């Protein structure tokens, strides 16, 4: 390029001697500035660069860090890699151990190994993610999911995720990739299997409900038996008390009459009731005899 500028300056009419010299100096300065610009490049933060040489190819021993660097123009070309971790979601349909179709999705956080960038460029180029991640993720998912039944994939999800991460990390090392995180984001089954699981859950709930009703009926039956035994015992004790003290019935009549009289006295509609209506007939000789016997019994 500088030689072309010099040739162009030589073809220009000489004219006044001072003007030709100034023009040549201007063109020379432009050529020098262009050469300096082509000799300098910058590696941004979170990036690394390697050199491709027109003579020797990729330089295996040169990995450039962030900052300003120099190169030989027209012979060395910098190839810049972004080494920051980037997320990628990959979905894959696969089969479980009990031959159920499973749709599983992973979120993979990956980055290139900065120390192996020259060999990565020779094998995979710059689009290494598209070349590597989908294939190794599908491979590992099919291998791991096939070890578990469909129900185990749900109940042992943490163990499945750990196994997928371990195998996928080891597999990615073969391609100079580092996986910072692997997580299961979605796990679904076919409609038929989902319907079967829901039906099974409904049946289990119905069975549990039926068992609960049976236990409830048994408890109610035991309660009635205990209540009947208590009432029978109370009746027996009452019979013994009456046989020993007949005045107990008279006392109950007096208390009942007192309650009735109090209720009528506080009511707005007052009526006249005889002693017979109050179950308190003081003229009844049997009542008097019962009361006397009750008083004697207390003494």
Curated annotation (Swiss-Prot):
It is found in: Mitochondrion inner membrane; Cytoplasm; Nucleus; Cell membrane. Keywords: Acetylation, Cell membrane, Coiled coil, Cytoplasm, Membrane, Mitochondrion, Mitochondrion inner membrane, Nucleus, Phosphoprotein, Receptor, Repressor, Transcription, Transcription regulation. Pfam families: Band_7. The keyword Nucleus applies. Gene3D superfamilies: Band 7 domain. InterPro entries: Band_7 (IPR001107), Band_7/SPFH_dom_sf (IPR036013), Prohibitin (IPR000163). The modification Phosphoserine is found at residue 151. One of its GO terms (cellular component) is mitochondrial inner membrane. GO terms for biological process: B cell activation; cell migration; mitochondrion organization; mitophagy; positive regulation of immunoglobulin production; positive regulation of non-canonical NF-kappaB signal transduction; regulation of cardiolipin metabolic process; regulation of cytochrome-c oxidase activity. Residues 190-238 form a coiled coil. The modification N-acetylalanine is found at residue 2. GO terms for molecular function: protein homodimerization activity; sphingolipid binding. Signal peptide: none annotated. The modification Phosphotyrosine is found at residue 128. Phosphorylated. Tyrosine phosphorylation is indirectly stimulated by IGFBP6. The modification N6-acetyllysine is found at residues 147, 200, 250, 262. Protein with pleiotropic attributes mediated in a cell-compartment- and tissue-specific manner, which include the plasma membrane-associated cell signaling functions, mitochondrial chaperone, and transcriptional co-regulator of transcription factors and sex steroid hormones in the nucleus. The mitochondrial prohibitin complex consists of two subunits (PHB1 and PHB2), assembled into a membrane-associated ring-shaped supercomplex of approximately 1 mDa. Interacts with ESR1, HDAC1 and HDAC5. Interacts with ZNF703. Interacts with STOML2. Interacts with ARFGEF3. Interacts with SPHK2. Interacts with COX4I1; the interaction associates PHB2 with COX. Interacts with MAP1LC3B (membrane-bound form LC3-II); the interaction is direct and upon mitochondrial depolarization and proteasome-dependent outer membrane rupture. Interacts with IGFBP6 (via C-terminal domain). Interacts with CLPB. LC3-interaction region (LIR) is required for interaction with MAP1LC3B/LC3-II and for Parkin-mediated mitophagy. This is Prohibitin-2. It comes from Bos taurus (Bovine).
């Amino acid at each position: 390029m500088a030689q072309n500028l010099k040739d162009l300056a030589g073809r220009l009419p000489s004219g006044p001697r001072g003007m030709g010299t100034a023009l040549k100096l201007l063109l020379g300065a432009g050529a020098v500035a262009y050469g300096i610009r082509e000799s300098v490049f910058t590696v941004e933060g979170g990036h690394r660069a390697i050199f491709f040489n027109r003579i020797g190819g990729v330089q295996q021993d040169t990995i450039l860090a962030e900052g300003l660097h120099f190169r030989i123009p027209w012979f060395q070309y910098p190839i810049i890699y972004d080494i920051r971790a980037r997320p990628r979601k990959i979905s894959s349909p696969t089969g479980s151990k009990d031959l159920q179709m499973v749709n599983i999705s992973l979120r993979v956080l990956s980055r290139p190994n900065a120390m192996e960038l020259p060999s990565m460029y020779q094998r995979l180029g710059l689009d290494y993610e598209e070349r590597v991640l989908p294939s190794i993720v599908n491979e590992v998912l099919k291998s791991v999911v096939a070890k578990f039944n469909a129900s185990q994939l749900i109940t042992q999800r943490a163990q499945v995720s750990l196994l997928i991460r371990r195998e996928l990390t080891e597999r990615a090392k073969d391609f100079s990739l580092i996986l910072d995180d692997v997580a299961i984001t979605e796990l679904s089954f076919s409609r038929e299997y989902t319907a079967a699981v829901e039906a099974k859950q409904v049946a289990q709930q119905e069975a549990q409900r039926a068992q609960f009703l049976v236990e409830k009926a048994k408890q109610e039956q035991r309660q009635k038996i205990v209540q009947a035994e208590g009432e029978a015992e109370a009746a027996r004790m009452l019979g013994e008390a009456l046989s020993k003290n007949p005045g107990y019935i008279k006392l109950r009549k007096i208390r009942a009459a007192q309650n009735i009289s109090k209720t009528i006295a506080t009511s707005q509609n007052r009526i006249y009731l005889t002693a017979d209506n109050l179950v308190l007939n003081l003229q009844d000789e049997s009542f008097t005899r019962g009361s006397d016997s009750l008083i004697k019994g207390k003494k």
